[in-house]
């Protein structure tokens, strides 16, 4: 459906003079005008109001052709896709006035600035149109036949600027809406960027009530239309086949989410800052100086930034009221100030929720998903499913954290409704052990259990995803597979370095998913990407069903967001002084947790213990991890300071408060939310998130989905990670609000606690100095290993030569950590690093931009180039760009890890010897 519009005739007030001026319909020109005054072309008119003069619904290209002839030849009319719902005179171009969901057989594309013309002359519209169709065919030959018919129209700058610049009309076999076309061409553009390096279609064409400017440009002052000068037509029609689109294309808006009135209630749960951030100040200034675009552009941006930065909306509205009132009085008297406030809140909330929420659609890119109902009454928080999931399906169980997903599976097993061999898969060893206990199952890492499973003495097993290849011989014998934490399992399968035999694990997973009678996948973080990754692994050969059990498990909880890390430690110390029980989860690292634990014990007298990679072998810590709440009671613990990786999957119900510090974006926001839920009963949550966490880059645009399932699934997860981490803090806030918590956002620091840096450094030095093969001090399990590494890196004769100074230097330099990171980097970046200097590191930055995907896959860290200097530091390379130390350390690292030293890091003597050996091998090969 095309509505044909002309500008509405009437009076317009000149803002400078206050004089009203009459404007006729023909005064509005919807063609670009080229003249001496505007050699680059004066843009087309943009009236505030229109008259709808005609409506057309062409069913074919043949019917579209006369309409195109009219639209291209009359500069005073313009088109909109959609049927007008309002009175046709004096109508504003907004979504509510037009039904934009009318399906049509006509596909309109705006192709703008593609430099690859296929070798055709810039006036050869037929050749260039066929070249576009050829590119579309290379992306999907089923949808876009090479002999597709088309109408091609030269856009205003065609012939004047390089590249393909045209409006291209195709005819579809089925009727589709603009929203469906936006979804289609979003996917087409993703493939096009990977294949050709550019977008094929301009997606703005498919926005609601977007003006379609078809009028040919106007030329004056001796400037000649280049097409007329060449005697070439600006409009051509070629008959041919139809485009073959699937009849179940989803609408783009359904993939982006919609606004719901219930979103407004989220604002009641937030108490924001009464101070503007820099971004909010900048947008307020833009508002104060604006002549137009305030309602649709500036206000939504202002509210979106305010919500992201935690600024209180009521305070913001008081601040902007004077400027907005003046704008309404002088430039837009058709709306009142509350309309602006409501639109800002609505647009900000829509983006806030839909950029963060993980939803399961009923139709996933054409694949229908069947929603199953749970048996839990609305007032009951815990998950109850009376009937076992259907056989022959892949069934996802999405339920809020702490509602009993694994308990439901345990009940099915106990009831005997999951007969035969049962395999539970998860992503951490701690959860393997936990699931083994819950399901009365054997463990993959116990030989006797594997043997008993093989001979049929037991029929239940628990394993990690990285050990799934061990079950290759059991393919066809597994009756039920249960994947616990399935979203995290898939993430590990795609990216985690711990999965050494990745492709074999993928193949075994695929075969078990195909052959198992019952497939159950459970997680609180399931999204469309989760389902697509698992479903596409088996080409959706099994129907997909899902349960969605959402409960507000934090409805009585209060969260407090702090502006800096030091405030968290002050709040934690205060809670201990008040006699409260507290747990802190932080990515600070073992040494900092140990130092803070020492300070808190000294400052408060509380019993504080640290759980991290260097303490899990300590007896007291091991018992806490194994026996959780009961052991905390027995040890009378006041406070735990924990690393998130060590406590993943370990749940407590003991503490009054949870504290969370997030310095880096190495873990996604949903994993930090799981850290917040480490204690299921805590009602006070204190958190700090460093600003550097936002803007995570996983190089999603650099994956080649034509390579197969692995790259397709990696791209799905990488793109979701980037979206959710675009504003890390905002996403985490949504998770808290969604679970019912209230949030107070503080703008002022609470100060600092008295640290124990000096005392802890002395303790760490003593721990390394006095360590032996049989003894390491508590919380310093790596001390003897550090001592041995120190000897190697500083080229000492033996551990007897280690001095306090050596240990101090080792603690400062961290040579093994630097070399280990350098090992991941040097193949990709060494040549670029060598080009850097103390003046610029641009060569490294540019290289990082081009290898984002590879960097993320190697390191698991953000490939955002803004961290380039930090990554050089992590390689032991300072601002002086001196690489002598890291080369020496890396050579030592290779020897420690029994790896050959790369040729580029060899000494002259080593190179000569290596070349000699290679020469001898070559001679031997020739002789053979």
UniProtKB/Swiss-Prot annotation:
Induction: Expressed in the early phase of the viral replicative cycle. Transmembrane segments: none annotated. Displays bipolar ssDNA and dsDNA unwinding activities that require the same core catalytic residues for unwinding in either direction, the 3'-5' direction being more robust. One of its GO terms (biological process) is DNA replication. This is Putative replication origin binding protein. ATP binds at residues 399-406. Keywords: ATP-binding, DNA-binding, Early protein, Nucleotide-binding. It comes from Escherichia phage T5 (Enterobacteria phage T5). GO terms for molecular function: ATP binding; DNA helicase activity; DNA replication origin binding. A motif (DEAD box) lies at residues 484-487. Residues 386-516 form the Helicase ATP-binding domain. Belongs to the herpesviridae oribp family. SUPFAM superfamilies: P-loop containing nucleoside triphosphate hydrolases. The keyword Nucleotide-binding applies.
């Amino acid at each position: 459906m095309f509505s044909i519009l002309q500008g509405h005739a009437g009076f317009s007030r000149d803002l400078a003079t206050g004089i009203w001026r009459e404007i006729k319909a023909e005064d509005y020109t919807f063609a670009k005008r080229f003249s001496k005054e505007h050699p680059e072309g004066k843009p087309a008119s943009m009236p505030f109001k229109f008259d709808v003069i005609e409506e057309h619904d062409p069913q074919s290209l043949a019917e579209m052709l006369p309409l195109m002839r009219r639209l291209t030849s009359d500069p005073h009319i313009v088109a909109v896709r959609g049927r007008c719902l309002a009175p046709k005179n004096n109508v504003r171009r907004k979504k509510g006035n037009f039904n934009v969901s009318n399906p049509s057989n006509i596909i309109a594309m705006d192709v703008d600035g593609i430099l690859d013309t296929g070798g055709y002359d810039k006036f050869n519209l037929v050749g260039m149109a066929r070249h576009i169709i050829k590119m579309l065919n290379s992306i999907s030959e089923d949808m876009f036949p090479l002999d597709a018919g088309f109408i091609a129209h030269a856009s205003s700058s065609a012939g004047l600027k390089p590249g393909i610049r045209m409006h291209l009309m195709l005819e579809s076999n089925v009727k589709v809406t603009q929203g469906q076309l936006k979804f289609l061409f979003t996917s087409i553009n993703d493939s096009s960027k990977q294949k050709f390096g550019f977008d094929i279609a301009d997606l703005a064409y498919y926005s609601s009530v977007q003006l379609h400017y078809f009028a040919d440009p106007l030329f004056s002052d001796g400037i000649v239309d280049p097409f007329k000068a060449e005697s070439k037509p600006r409009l051509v029609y070629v008959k041919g086949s139809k485009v073959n689109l699937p009849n179940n294309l989803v609408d783009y808006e359904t993939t982006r989410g919609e606004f719901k009135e219930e979103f407004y209630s989220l604002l009641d749960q937030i108490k924001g800052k009464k101070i503007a951030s820099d971004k909010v100040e900048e947008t307020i200034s833009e508002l104060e100086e604006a002549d137009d675009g305030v309602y649709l552009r500036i206000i939504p941006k202002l509210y979106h930034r305010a919500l992201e930065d935690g600024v209180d909306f009521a305070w913001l509205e008081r601040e902007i009221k004077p400027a907005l009132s003046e704008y309404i009085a002088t430039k837009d008297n058709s709306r009142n100030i509350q309309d602006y406030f409501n639109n800002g809140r609505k647009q900000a909330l829509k983006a806030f929720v839909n950029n963060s929420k993980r939803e399961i659609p009923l139709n996933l890119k054409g694949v229908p998903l069947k929603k199953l109902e749970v048996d839990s009454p609305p007032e009951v928080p815990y998950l109850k499913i009376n009937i076992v999931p259907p056989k022959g399906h892949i069934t996802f169980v999405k339920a809020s954290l702490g509602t009993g997903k694994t308990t439901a599976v345990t009940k099915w097993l106990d009831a005997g409704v999951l007969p035969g061999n049962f395999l539970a898969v998860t992503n951490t060893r701690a959860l393997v052990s936990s699931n083994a206990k819950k399901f009365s199952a054997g463990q993959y890492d116990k030989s006797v259990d594997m043997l008993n499973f093989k001979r049929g003495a037991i029929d239940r097993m628990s394993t990690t995803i990285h050990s799934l290849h061990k079950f290759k011989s059991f393919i066809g014998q597994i009756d039920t597979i249960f994947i616990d934490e399935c979203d995290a399992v898939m993430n590990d399968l795609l990216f985690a370095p711990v999965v050494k035999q990745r492709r074999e694990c993928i193949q075994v997973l695929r075969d078990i998913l195909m052959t198992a009678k019952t497939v159950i996948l459970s997680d609180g973080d399931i999204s469309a990407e989760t389902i697509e990754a698992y479903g596409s692994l088996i080409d959706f050969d099994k129907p997909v069903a899902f349960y969605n059990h959402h409960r507000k498990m934090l409805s009585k909880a209060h969260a407090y967001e702090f502006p800096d890390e030091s405030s968290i430690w002050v709040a934690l110390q205060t809670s201990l002084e008040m006699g409260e029980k507290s747990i802190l989860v932080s990515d600070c690292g073992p040494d900092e947790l140990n130092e803070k634990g020492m300070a808190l014990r000294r400052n408060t007298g509380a019993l504080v213990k640290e759980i991290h990679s260097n303490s899990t072998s300590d007896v007291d810590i091991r018992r806490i991890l194994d026996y959780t709440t009961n052991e905390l009671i027995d040890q009378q613990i006041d406070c735990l300071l924990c690393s998130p990786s060590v406590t993943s999957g370990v749940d407590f119900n003991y503490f009054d408060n949870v504290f969370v510090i997030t310095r880096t974006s190495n873990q996604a926001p949903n994993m930090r939310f799981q850290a917040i839920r480490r204690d299921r009963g805590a009602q006070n949550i204190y958190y700090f998130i460093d600003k550097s966490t936002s803007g995570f880059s996983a190089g999603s645009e650099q994956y080649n989905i034509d390579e197969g399932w692995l790259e397709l699934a990696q791209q799905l997860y990488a793109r979701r990670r980037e979206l959710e981490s675009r504003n890390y803090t905002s996403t985490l806030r949504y998770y808290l609000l969604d679970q019912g918590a209230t949030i107070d956002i503080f703008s002022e620091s609470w100060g600092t606690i008295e640290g124990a840096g000096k005392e802890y450094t002395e303790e760490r030095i003593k721990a390394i100095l006095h360590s032996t093969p049989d003894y390491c001090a508590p919380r310093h399990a790596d001390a003897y290993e550090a001592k041995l590494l120190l000897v190697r890196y500083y080229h000492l004769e033996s551990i007897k030569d280690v001095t306090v100074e050596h240990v101090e230097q080792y603690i400062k330099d961290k040579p093994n950590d630097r070399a280990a990171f350098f090992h991941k980097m040097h193949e990709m970046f060494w040549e670029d690093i060598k080009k850097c200097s103390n003046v610029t590191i641009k060569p490294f930055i540019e290289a990082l931009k081009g290898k984002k995907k590879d960097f993320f896959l190697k390191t698991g860290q953000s490939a955002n180039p803004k961290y380039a200097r930090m990554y050089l530091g992590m390689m032991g390379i300072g601002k002086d760009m001196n690489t002598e130390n890291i080369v020496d350390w890396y050579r030592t690292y290779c020897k420690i890890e029994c790896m050959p030293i790369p040729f580029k890091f060899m000494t002259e003597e080593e190179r000569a010897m290596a070349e000699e050996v290679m020469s001898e091998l070559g001679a031997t090969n020739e002789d053979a």
